[in-house]
């Protein structure tokens, strides 16, 4: 069953401005080490960061809290599987909020889709609960 749904559309130019203005301070505050390493290894860094930013916003919406309600940016992180497929990894308060959404004796899978077409980056999150076992 679906217990959370979120989407976000981010302007890549906005992320470019944040990177130019705040540089490493912005990147360190928002993105996990894995996200930074992935984005910095790519030619289109700003597009990569923008997709990950959109994914975090979409995830916070799917969790029902938004960013302002105690969930830290780094409590949500996009990880790419060896196949390249992106997944969302939750820790700390984001993980606790996810547990609150789940019916008893259920686990969750977080489905993530990200795309970009300059100047836009977009992400969708679906949180699905399924019975354990």
Swiss-Prot record:
Disulphide bonds in the chain: none
Origin: domain of life: Bacteria
Annotated EC: 2.7.8.7
GO terms for MF: holo-[acyl-carrier-protein] synthase activity; magnesium ion binding
First-level EC class: transferase
Keywords, sorted A to Z: Cytoplasm, Fatty acid biosynthesis, Fatty acid metabolism, Lipid biosynthesis, Lipid metabolism, Magnesium, Metal-binding, Transferase
Positions of Mg(2+) binding: 8, 57
Coiled coil: none
GO biological process: fatty acid biosynthetic process
Cited InterPro entries: 4-PPantetheinyl_Trfase_dom (IPR008278), 4-PPantetheinyl_Trfase_dom_sf (IPR037143), ACPS (IPR002582), Ppantetheine-prot_Trfase_dom (IPR004568)
Compartmental location: Cytoplasm
Alphabetical list of Pfam families matching this protein: ACPS
Chief place where the protein resides: cytoplasm
Cofactor(s) demanded: Mg(2+)
Gene Ontology cellular component terms for the protein in this record: cytoplasm
Catalytic activity: apo-[ACP] + CoA = holo-[ACP] + adenosine 3',5'-bisphosphate + H(+)
Protein purpose: Transfers the 4'-phosphopantetheine moiety from coenzyme A to a Ser of acyl-carrier-protein.
Entries under NCBIfam families matching the protein: acpS, pantethn_trn
Family: Belongs to the P-Pant transferase superfamily. AcpS family.
Protein's recorded name: Holo-[acyl-carrier-protein] synthase
Annotated organism of origin: Bartonella henselae (strain ATCC 49882 / DSM 28221 / CCUG 30454 / Houston 1) (Rochalimaea henselae)
Gene coding for it: acpS
């Amino acid at each position: 069953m679906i217990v959370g749904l979120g989407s976000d559309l981010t302007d890549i130019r906005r992320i470019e401005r944040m990177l130019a203005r705040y540089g490493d301070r912005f990147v360190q505050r928002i993105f996990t080490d894995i996200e930074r390493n992935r984005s910095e290894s790519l030619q289109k860094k700003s597009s990569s960061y923008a997709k990950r930013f959109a994914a975090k916003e979409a995830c916070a919406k799917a969790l029902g809290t938004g960013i302002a309600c105690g969930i830290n940016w780094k409590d949500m992180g996009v990880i790419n599987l060896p196949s390249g497929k992106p997944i969302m990894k939750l820790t700390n308060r984001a993980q606790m909020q996810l547990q609150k959404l789940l019916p008893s004796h259920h686990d969750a899978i977080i489905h993530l889709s990200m795309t970009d077409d300059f100047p836009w980056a977009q992400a969708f999150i679906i949180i699905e609960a399924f019975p354990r076992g």
